[in-house]
Swiss-Prot record:
The gene is rpl29. Keywords: Chloroplast, Plastid, Ribonucleoprotein, Ribosomal protein. Belongs to the universal ribosomal protein uL29 family. One of its GO terms (molecular function) is structural constituent of ribosome. This is Large ribosomal subunit protein uL29c. Its main location: plastid. It comes from Gracilaria tenuistipitata var. liui (Red alga). Pfam families: Ribosomal_L29 (PF00831). GO terms for biological process: translation. InterPro entries: Ribosomal_protein_uL29, Ribosomal_uL29, Ribosomal_uL29_sf. It comes from the Eukaryota. GO terms for cellular component: chloroplast; cytosolic large ribosomal subunit. The lineage of its organism: Eukaryota, Rhodophyta, Florideophyceae, Rhodymeniophycidae, Gracilariales. It is found in: Plastid, Chloroplast.
Amino acid sequence: MPLPKIQDIQDFTDKEIEEKIIKLKKEIFDLKLKQATRQNVRSHLFKHKKHQLAQLLTIKKDSNYV
């Protein structure tokens, strides 16, 4: 599964971006919790979720300056 491109999320509204940020933070927390309790975790998802979160935060920051 390739990492998502920033072009895929640039057209989102501010509300959609906020919702996705909250959702991704929850997913990252859940992954960390699973890892801490030694449940089966696909470790590559950490990188993907953090990458998506960074993209969303960048888009959010850029839209605040416009």
